[in-house]
Design a protein with these regions (language model features):
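Glycine-rich phosphate-binding loops of nucleotide-dependent enzymes
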Residues: 2-254
Protein backbone atom coordinates (compact mmCIF):
# COMPACT_ATOMS: atom_id res chain seq x y z
CA UNK A 1 0.00 0.00 0.00
CA UNK A 2 1.31 3.44 -0.92
CA UNK A 3 1.94 5.71 2.04
CA UNK A 4 -0.07 8.96 2.01
CA UNK A 5 1.79 12.10 0.97
CA UNK A 6 2.40 14.44 3.92
CA UNK A 7 0.69 17.79 3.71
CA UNK A 8 3.73 19.39 5.35
CA UNK A 9 7.24 17.95 5.67
CA UNK A 10 10.22 19.27 7.60
CA UNK A 11 13.66 17.81 7.00
CA UNK A 12 16.70 18.62 9.10
CA UNK A 13 15.21 21.86 10.40
CA UNK A 14 17.54 23.87 12.60
CA UNK A 15 17.19 27.32 14.11
CA UNK A 16 19.95 29.28 15.82
CA UNK A 17 20.02 32.71 17.40
CA UNK A 18 23.67 33.60 17.36
CA UNK A 19 25.45 30.96 19.46
CA UNK A 20 22.16 29.65 20.89
CA UNK A 21 20.78 26.60 19.07
CA UNK A 22 17.01 26.49 19.61
CA UNK A 23 16.05 23.72 17.15
CA UNK A 24 18.32 20.83 16.13
CA UNK A 25 17.82 18.70 13.00
CA UNK A 26 14.08 18.15 13.33
CA UNK A 27 12.30 15.89 10.82
CA UNK A 28 8.51 16.03 10.97
CA UNK A 29 5.64 15.02 8.70
CA UNK A 30 2.14 16.42 9.12
CA UNK A 31 -0.68 14.59 7.34
CA UNK A 32 -4.08 15.91 6.18
CA UNK A 33 -6.88 15.93 8.72
CA UNK A 34 -4.86 15.05 11.82
CA UNK A 35 -4.37 16.86 15.11
CA UNK A 36 -0.69 16.82 16.07
CA UNK A 37 0.29 18.04 19.54
CA UNK A 38 3.80 19.43 19.99
CA UNK A 39 4.74 19.26 23.65
CA UNK A 40 7.74 19.93 25.82
CA UNK A 41 8.95 21.97 28.75
CA UNK A 42 9.89 25.64 28.52
CA UNK A 43 12.94 26.04 26.32
CA UNK A 44 12.32 22.75 24.51
CA UNK A 45 12.27 24.42 21.09
CA UNK A 46 8.52 24.26 20.44
CA UNK A 47 8.03 27.98 19.91
CA UNK A 48 11.07 28.31 17.65
CA UNK A 49 9.93 25.38 15.53
CA UNK A 50 6.45 26.85 15.21
CA UNK A 51 7.91 30.21 14.21
CA UNK A 52 9.69 28.45 11.34
CA UNK A 53 6.53 26.63 10.23
CA UNK A 54 4.45 29.81 10.45
CA UNK A 55 6.94 31.95 8.52
CA UNK A 56 7.72 34.20 11.46
CA UNK A 57 11.35 33.00 11.37
CA UNK A 58 13.41 31.49 8.56
CA UNK A 59 15.23 28.25 9.41
CA UNK A 60 18.99 28.28 9.84
CA UNK A 61 19.15 24.81 8.27
CA UNK A 62 16.91 22.25 6.63
CA UNK A 63 14.06 22.25 4.13
CA UNK A 64 10.26 22.55 4.12
CA UNK A 65 7.89 21.05 1.57
CA UNK A 66 4.14 21.10 1.02
CA UNK A 67 2.66 18.02 -0.66
CA UNK A 68 6.14 17.02 -1.74
CA UNK A 69 7.04 20.36 -3.34
CA UNK A 70 9.78 22.55 -1.81
CA UNK A 71 8.58 25.82 -0.28
CA UNK A 72 10.19 28.70 1.57
CA UNK A 73 8.35 30.78 4.15
CA UNK A 74 10.07 34.16 4.43
CA UNK A 75 7.08 35.70 6.22
CA UNK A 76 3.72 34.76 7.73
CA UNK A 77 2.11 35.92 4.47
CA UNK A 78 4.17 33.33 2.59
CA UNK A 79 2.90 30.66 4.96
CA UNK A 80 -0.69 31.89 4.54
CA UNK A 81 -0.31 31.77 0.76
CA UNK A 82 0.52 28.07 1.16
CA UNK A 83 -2.40 27.43 3.52
CA UNK A 84 -0.65 27.63 6.91
CA UNK A 85 -2.28 29.96 9.46
CA UNK A 86 -1.21 30.56 13.06
CA UNK A 87 -3.45 31.54 15.97
CA UNK A 88 -1.22 32.83 18.76
CA UNK A 89 -2.13 32.85 22.42
CA UNK A 90 -3.05 36.56 22.33
CA UNK A 91 -5.26 35.87 19.23
CA UNK A 92 -4.14 39.16 17.57
CA UNK A 93 -7.70 40.51 17.58
CA UNK A 94 -8.67 44.19 17.66
CA UNK A 95 -11.01 44.31 20.68
CA UNK A 96 -12.90 47.47 19.72
CA UNK A 97 -13.63 46.32 16.18
CA UNK A 98 -16.61 44.13 15.33
CA UNK A 99 -16.53 40.41 14.73
CA UNK A 100 -16.86 40.91 10.97
CA UNK A 101 -14.11 43.54 10.93
CA UNK A 102 -11.77 41.16 12.75
CA UNK A 103 -12.54 38.20 10.49
CA UNK A 104 -11.76 40.29 7.40
CA UNK A 105 -8.92 42.37 8.87
CA UNK A 106 -6.35 42.87 6.11
CA UNK A 107 -8.57 41.27 3.46
CA UNK A 108 -11.64 43.50 3.47
CA UNK A 109 -14.31 43.05 0.79
CA UNK A 110 -15.30 46.05 -1.32
CA UNK A 111 -18.00 46.94 -3.84
CA UNK A 112 -18.36 49.65 -6.52
CA UNK A 113 -19.84 52.95 -5.38
CA UNK A 114 -21.32 55.50 -7.82
CA UNK A 115 -18.46 55.14 -10.32
CA UNK A 116 -16.69 51.91 -11.40
CA UNK A 117 -13.34 53.06 -10.04
CA UNK A 118 -14.74 54.10 -6.65
CA UNK A 119 -15.08 51.33 -4.10
CA UNK A 120 -16.36 51.16 -0.55
CA UNK A 121 -16.40 48.42 2.07
CA UNK A 122 -19.01 45.76 1.41
CA UNK A 123 -20.17 45.52 5.01
CA UNK A 124 -23.24 43.41 4.30
CA UNK A 125 -21.21 40.75 2.51
CA UNK A 126 -18.54 40.71 5.22
CA UNK A 127 -21.22 40.26 7.88
CA UNK A 128 -22.84 37.43 5.91
CA UNK A 129 -19.51 35.69 5.24
CA UNK A 130 -18.43 36.03 8.88
CA UNK A 131 -21.67 34.44 9.98
CA UNK A 132 -21.05 31.57 7.56
CA UNK A 133 -17.57 30.91 8.95
CA UNK A 134 -18.79 30.96 12.54
CA UNK A 135 -21.72 28.72 11.64
CA UNK A 136 -19.26 26.19 10.19
CA UNK A 137 -17.72 26.04 13.66
CA UNK A 138 -21.13 25.70 15.32
CA UNK A 139 -20.20 28.75 17.41
CA UNK A 140 -23.09 30.36 19.28
CA UNK A 141 -22.36 33.87 18.02
CA UNK A 142 -25.05 35.60 15.96
CA UNK A 143 -24.39 39.36 15.95
CA UNK A 144 -21.46 40.06 13.62
CA UNK A 145 -21.56 43.77 14.51
CA UNK A 146 -20.72 43.06 18.14
CA UNK A 147 -17.31 44.34 19.33
CA UNK A 148 -14.86 41.54 20.08
CA UNK A 149 -14.16 43.03 23.52
CA UNK A 150 -17.68 41.95 24.54
CA UNK A 151 -17.08 38.29 23.70
CA UNK A 152 -16.01 35.48 26.00
CA UNK A 153 -12.59 33.87 25.66
CA UNK A 154 -13.99 30.89 23.78
CA UNK A 155 -15.97 33.10 21.43
CA UNK A 156 -12.83 35.11 20.68
CA UNK A 157 -11.06 31.89 19.74
CA UNK A 158 -13.94 31.18 17.35
CA UNK A 159 -13.42 34.58 15.70
CA UNK A 160 -9.67 33.95 15.36
CA UNK A 161 -10.33 30.53 13.82
CA UNK A 162 -12.89 32.07 11.45
CA UNK A 163 -10.21 34.45 10.23
CA UNK A 164 -7.97 31.45 9.48
CA UNK A 165 -10.85 29.87 7.54
CA UNK A 166 -11.23 33.13 5.65
CA UNK A 167 -7.63 32.64 4.47
CA UNK A 168 -8.60 29.09 3.41
CA UNK A 169 -5.98 27.61 5.72
CA UNK A 170 -5.40 23.87 5.45
CA UNK A 171 -3.09 23.79 8.47
CA UNK A 172 -4.04 25.78 11.56
CA UNK A 173 -1.40 26.18 14.25
CA UNK A 174 -2.90 26.87 17.68
CA UNK A 175 -0.59 28.14 20.43
CA UNK A 176 -1.90 27.36 23.94
CA UNK A 177 -5.55 27.79 22.87
CA UNK A 178 -7.03 27.19 26.34
CA UNK A 179 -4.50 29.19 28.36
CA UNK A 180 -6.16 31.42 30.99
CA UNK A 181 -9.64 30.11 30.12
CA UNK A 182 -12.12 28.66 32.58
CA UNK A 183 -13.52 25.14 32.35
CA UNK A 184 -16.59 26.09 30.29
CA UNK A 185 -14.63 28.24 27.83
CA UNK A 186 -11.91 25.60 27.50
CA UNK A 187 -14.55 23.02 26.62
CA UNK A 188 -15.86 25.35 23.90
CA UNK A 189 -12.39 25.72 22.40
CA UNK A 190 -11.84 21.95 22.43
CA UNK A 191 -15.13 21.55 20.58
CA UNK A 192 -13.99 24.13 18.00
CA UNK A 193 -10.81 22.13 17.37
CA UNK A 194 -12.80 18.90 17.02
CA UNK A 195 -15.02 20.67 14.50
CA UNK A 196 -11.97 21.73 12.48
CA UNK A 197 -10.80 18.12 12.39
CA UNK A 198 -14.22 16.82 11.38
CA UNK A 199 -14.18 19.29 8.48
CA UNK A 200 -10.85 17.87 7.29
CA UNK A 201 -8.56 20.63 8.57
CA UNK A 202 -5.15 19.84 9.99
CA UNK A 203 -4.35 21.26 13.43
CA UNK A 204 -0.94 21.63 15.05
CA UNK A 205 -1.53 22.12 18.76
CA UNK A 206 1.07 23.57 21.11
CA UNK A 207 0.05 23.04 24.70
CA UNK A 208 1.35 22.54 28.22
CA UNK A 209 -2.06 21.14 29.18
CA UNK A 210 -1.69 17.39 28.81
CA UNK A 211 -5.40 16.82 29.41
CA UNK A 212 -6.15 18.91 26.31
CA UNK A 213 -3.58 16.91 24.37
CA UNK A 214 -5.14 13.59 25.41
CA UNK A 215 -8.61 14.92 24.55
CA UNK A 216 -7.66 16.10 21.05
CA UNK A 217 -4.47 14.71 19.57
CA UNK A 218 -4.08 11.88 17.08
CA UNK A 219 -0.31 12.06 17.43
CA UNK A 220 2.08 13.56 19.95
CA UNK A 221 5.51 15.05 19.32
CA UNK A 222 7.69 15.78 22.34
CA UNK A 223 10.71 18.05 22.16
CA UNK A 224 13.58 18.72 24.53
CA UNK A 225 16.72 20.82 24.15
CA UNK A 226 15.71 21.63 20.58
CA UNK A 227 15.39 18.00 19.48
CA UNK A 228 12.38 15.86 18.67
CA UNK A 229 12.66 12.69 20.74
CA UNK A 230 9.08 11.36 20.67
CA UNK A 231 6.79 11.15 17.64
CA UNK A 232 4.03 8.57 17.98
CA UNK A 233 0.27 8.04 17.87
CA UNK A 234 -1.42 9.07 21.10
CA UNK A 235 -3.01 5.64 21.48
CA UNK A 236 -3.68 4.84 25.13
CA UNK A 237 -1.25 7.38 26.54
CA UNK A 238 -2.57 9.34 29.50
CA UNK A 239 -1.81 12.87 30.66
CA UNK A 240 0.47 11.40 33.33
CA UNK A 241 2.29 9.31 30.72
CA UNK A 242 2.98 12.41 28.64
CA UNK A 243 4.21 14.34 31.66
CA UNK A 244 6.61 11.53 32.55
CA UNK A 245 7.86 11.39 28.94
CA UNK A 246 8.56 15.13 28.98
CA UNK A 247 10.40 14.84 32.29
CA UNK A 248 12.42 11.88 30.98
CA UNK A 249 13.43 13.94 27.98
CA UNK A 250 14.50 16.80 30.22
CA UNK A 251 16.69 14.41 32.20
CA UNK A 252 18.36 13.17 29.00
CA UNK A 253 18.99 16.74 27.85
CA UNK A 254 20.48 17.80 31.19
Amino acid sequence: MTSPTPLLSLRGIGKSYGPVVAVREVDLDIFPGEVVAICGDNGAGKSSLIKVISGAEEPSAGAISMRGKPVAFASPHDALDHGVATIYQDLALAPRLTIAQNVFMGSELTRPFLLPFLRVLDKKRMIAESQRYLSQLSAAVTDMTRPVERLSGGQRQAVAISRALRWNAEIIIMDEPTAALGVKESALVLDLIRKLKSDGRTVILISHNMRDVVALADRVVIMGAGRKYVDQPLGDLTADDLTHMIMAGNAKAA
